A protein has these predicted regions:
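Short, aromatic/basic amphipathic alpha-helical patches
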Residues: 80-90
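Mobile genetic element proteins and their domesticated derivatives, centered on retroelements
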Residues: 30, 56, 73, 87, ...
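Extended, low-complexity cationic-aromatic segments
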Residues: 1-57, 153-154
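Acidic/histidine-rich, metal-coordinating catalytic segments
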Residues: 66-79, 105
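RNase H-like polynucleotidyl transferase catalytic core
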Residues: 12-20, 90-106
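C-terminal anion-handling pockets and recognition modules
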Residues: 38, 107-156
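Short, basic/hydrophobic alpha-helical segments
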Residues: 51-69
Length: 156
């Protein structure tokens, strides 16, 4: 990832370099909680219903209690029959946000922070990316999450 903005001395142009190679895409599936906890996984390629279902079964659901609620946007894999089947079989409640409503989704604000960190560290070698992602998630703290949830009208 590359930065979108830069600083420079007055009347001087900001200069930076970026390699021209096109790496394969890396996808991160994650969740965020009011207390600052996150549960995430990283893999290459896009998100399929099978990958999202596996994330739910092996990573997210084991960390949740019966009072938790999973809030999902309208990504196609979130609406897959197998995903709904897994969620219905669990004791966890779930709901979907209205279409085109990122302002109600605290995870969008978390992604902004994660992506800003990854742009800042300028990882250009694929083997260094997992470590950078781990460090990026460590920057998410409970006070951040509290603010994100409040700004999305999730907490009164």
């Amino acid at each position: 990832m590359t930065r979108h903005y830069a600083r420079s001395k007055s009347n001087e142009r900001a200069v930076d370099s970026t390699p021209v190679n096109t790496p394969c895409s890396t996808t991160i599936l994650s969740s965020v909680r009011l207390n600052g906890q996150t549960a995430y996984t990283v893999y290459h390629g896009g998100t399929t219903a099978e990958q999202f279902a596996e994330y739910l079964k092996s990573i997210l659901l084991p960390t949740l209690s019966k009072d938790d609620i999973i809030v999902m946007d309208n990504m196609r894999s979130h609406h897959a029959k197998m995903v709904k089947k897994i969620l219905d079989a669990s004791v966890i409640r779930y709901l979907y946000l209205p279409p085109y409503s990122p302002d109600f989704n605290p995870i969008e604000k978390m992604w902004s922070k994660i992506k800003a960190y990854l742009r800042k560290v300028k990882i250009r070698v694929a083997t260094e990316l997992p470590n950078a992602i781990d460090k990026a998630f460590l920057t998410v703290c409970p006070s951040d999450c509290s603010g994100w949830f409040s700004s999305c009208y999730c907490v009164r």
